[in-house]
Design a protein with these regions (language model features):
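Juxtamembrane helix-capping/reentrant segments at transmembrane boundaries
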Residues: 38-59
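Hydrophobic alpha-helical transmembrane segments in multi-pass integral membrane proteins
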Residues: 59-68, 123
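Hydrophobic core segments of alpha-helical transmembrane domains in multi-pass membrane proteins
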Residues: 15-26, 78-85
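A cytosolic-side transmembrane-helix exit/cap motif
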Residues: 36-45, 96-104
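Alpha-helical transmembrane segments of multipass membrane proteins
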Residues: 4-5, 32, 61, 65
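Short, strongly hydrophobic alpha-helical membrane anchors
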Residues: 1-9
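Membrane-proximal cytosolic segments adjacent to transmembrane helices
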Residues: 87-134
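Hydrophobic alpha-helical transmembrane segments and immediately flanking/interface helices
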Residues: 69-99
Length: 134
């Protein structure tokens, strides 16, 4: 029952949603790794990070509801919200990887920054908040 409701709320489980889930989980894990490496691991900061990640999925669900109830068909808002957060999480993930000393392929940086720049028009404030890292 819960799975069915989540599927309806999120607009189904497609490749975009799976990609977002992967990016969110990996970004959170790399954020924890950075905090561990810096000796700043905090359950309070971690909980706040989890709350922010949950909010991402609530916003995807809200966008889906707006697509279905207001626009009527398609998934324009849902797709835009997912692209925004995939790019945001991807940029954050690369920052975390760089912070841990991992070299980042330039092409990957370019693609994520390009995607981030295109979706940045959705909300400049949200992208600044997410870039603070977890």
């Amino acid at each position: 029952a819960v799975g069915g409701w989540l599927g309806w709320f999120m607009g189904g489980c497609d490749g975009l949603l799976y990609a977002l889930i992967a990016f969110v989980v990996i970004d959170y894990l790399t954020g924890v790794m950075c905090a561990f490496a810096d000796h700043t691991l905090s359950s309070e900061v971690g909980f706040r990070g989890i709350c922010r990640k949950v909010l991402i999925f609530l916003l995807v669900g809200m966008a889906n509801i707006l697509d279905v109830a207001v626009i009527g068909n398609g998934s324009v808002l849902r797709t835009a919200v997912i692209f925004f957060y995939i790019s945001n999480e991807g940029v954050s993930l690369l920052e975390n990887a760089g912070h841990l000393g991992l070299p980042i392929p330039q092409k990957m940086k370019d693609v994520l920054e390009q995607l981030h720049d295109k979706s940045e028009g959705v909300s400049d404030d949200a992208s600044e908040d997410e870039e603070e890292g977890e």
